[in-house]
């Protein structure tokens, strides 16, 4: 189990600096990367492409966003009440 934790820590990557969001508050950065991931996924699926190119956005929003926000947004997307334009 300790080896698993060490592997996770070694492979953990946080979100890199994004010049569009230079201030400490990263709420907008979280939101934008969540939207970008789902837009990328939708576009690549429509083209029949590989959605693995979208994984970068997913890693960033998972690093920045609280889990409860992501869960709520996923539920809203499933219900059709998500406020963002994807």
Swiss-Prot record:
Subcellular location field: Mitochondrion inner membrane
Associated pathway: Energy metabolism; oxidative phosphorylation
Disulfide bonds: 30-65, 40-54
Record has DNA damage as a keyword: no
SUPFAM superfamilies referenced in this protein's UniProt entry, alphabetically: Cytochrome c oxidase subunit h (SSF47694)
Superkingdom of origin: Eukaryota
Annotated protein name in UniProt: Cytochrome c oxidase subunit 6B1
Gene that this sequence comes from: COX6B1
